[in-house]
Amino acid sequence: MKKLLSVLMVLSFLHVSAQVPAGEQAKTKDDEKKLTDNPNGWKLGGTGSLTFNQVGLKNWAAGGDPSISLLGVINAYADYKFGKHLWQNRLGLEYGTQKIKDQAIRKNSDRLEIFSKYGYAVSKKWYASAYINMRTLMSPTFEYDDDGNKTQMISKFANPMIIDGAIGMDYVPNQYFSMFMSPVATKMIIVADDKIAILDRHGALGNNFRFELGAVAILSYKQEIVKNVNVQSVLRLFKDYKKGPAQNIDVDWQNTIGLKVNKFLSAAVFTHLIWDYDQLIPQFENGIETGVARKLQFRNVIGVGLAYTMEKKIEKVVPEEK
């Protein structure tokens, strides 16, 4: 069942991002030209958003709890092109808090991710590439009892820290879609704090360190599908060679649909799906933890708030490589 889920996800992703109607063939050729004609030098930019949500209730017969939440997101990039060489860098920051009724303020979102990839063009659409990626969070995360009191810390900065990298080939047919494939990929899970490691929540199997060697495929799609509506999707599939078929493939799939209202106001829908055989999720019954189980993880965020986009190009003239 899990294998079927992964296959269906890949097929649906490819269908959406790679299908080109007959009437769009001329546009696709223009996109390819834009990709190859990008000037040498740096291209810097990013987006920042701040989303605020508030629910107020007074004498509300249907019930519910008043709440306030705040979410900040920063996504920045720095790309450098020099002849056939392409170096891409990404920084992702996300932090959110919420306050429900009389409870103390709690964190409900936390992400710090750094990505760097180097590629050398071996043909018009293929790059020999290597990348490294680091993911962690910025502040401690706690579990709470029914009264809202902290019970135990389950994560903090660099606990866990997930570092993965690979050497492979990158297929880039146009400026919207890319597919990276590698039979030589590594994944390291670091949980330096013994008290957090022993909880076995982050895939390190109760240890401070775990190393995996396998294969990886990363599919990326980003495009303005209609005016002021942008879609971005990144699907990451990793297979540990030591795992048998029953353990299947690790899946990390992030999707964002953004709607730009004006220069400073925007709306967005974000979804994040994870399947990891080694991550055990606590199970509760009547507020009491009864054990752990492997579960499909899913998170979604819908928000309207302030947003700002910036971009800067620093062109550099270089002689063409033969």
List where the protein language model places each region.
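Residues that define the transmembrane beta-barrel architecture of outer-membrane proteins
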Residues: 66-72, 108-112, 159-163, 209-215, ...
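Extracellular loop and loop/strand-boundary signature of outer-membrane beta-barrel proteins
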Residues: 58-64, 99-104, 149-155, 202-207, ...
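Transmembrane beta-strands of outer-membrane beta-barrel pores
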Residues: 50-56, 82-84, 93-99, 134-140, ...
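Outer-membrane beta-barrel "beta-signal"
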Residues: 296-322
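Sec-dependent signal peptide cleavage junction
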Residues: 16-47, 313-322
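Outer-membrane pore/translocation modules
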Residues: 106-214, 291
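Repeated loop/turn-to-beta-strand initiation elements of outer-membrane beta-barrel proteins
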Residues: 85-87, 125-128, 176-179, 228-231, ...
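Residues on the lipid-exposed face of transmembrane beta-strands in outer-membrane beta-barrel proteins
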Residues: 46, 50-52, 72-80, 114-120, ...
